[in-house]
From Swiss-Prot:
Locations listed in the record: Nucleus
Name of the protein described by the UniProt record: Type 1 phosphatases regulator ypi1
Gene (UniProt): ypi1
A Pfam family hit: PPI_Ypi1
Region Disordered, annotated ranges: 1-53, 83-172
């Protein structure tokens, strides 16, 4: 037979421990079996505040409806666009340099081809083969020759597109 003993609970704690110990103790073998019973929080804080109301998001009157869909969300979605100089368009790439960059192996007034299909002309006789290959690829002299892929046209992502409403065609 075993008896069940309950440990005293603190006033601020909602969990308790029950320890079961055997009644008869044999000196040769002590066998202890324990049962741990866990209970959830009773729903109040130490100051008597109800947790069910404090854990939920409360929307103030100035919260804007998320994209007109009748939903309010606590997630913040920001799309960062890097600041650009006034004359630079958003379609220009930050990684590529223009063909007017000076190459140490070429004359600055020599036309340097920037695409694979362009003919080198005088530039092929004055530039080293590695520099010419870099210039035909459109990369600057200091960059590696591995960027041969053309960049795809950038389209707006899901957060930048306006949602389509089924009930109101053409409005919004």
């Amino acid at each position: 037979m075993s008896r069940t003993q309950q440990a005293p609970m603190n006033a601020g704690s909602a969990s308790g421990v029950q320890v079961a110990s055997p009644l008869s103790q044999d000196n040769s073998t002590i066998r202890v079996s324990g049962t741990l019973r866990l209970r959830g929080d009773n729903g109040t804080r130490n100051n008597g505040e109800d947790l069910t109301t404090t854990r939920h998001i409360r929307w103030s009157e100035d919260v804007v409806d998320n994209e007109g869909m009748g939903k309010k969300s606590s997630k913040v979605c920001c799309i960062y666009h890097k600041d650009r100089p006034v004359g630079e368009s958003s379609s220009e790439s930050d990684d590529t340099d223009s063909s007017s960059d000076d190459c140490s192996d070429c004359d600055s007034d020599t036309r340097i081809p920037t695409h694979k299909g362009d003919q080198g002309g005088e530039a092929s006789s004055r530039c080293s083969p590695s520099r010419l290959a870099e210039r035909k690829c459109g990369t600057s002299c200091s960059k590696r020759h591995s960027k041969q892929r053309s960049r795809r046209h950038m389209s707006p992502n899901a957060y930048e597109k306006m949602p389509k409403f089924k009930g109101q065609p053409g409005k919004r």
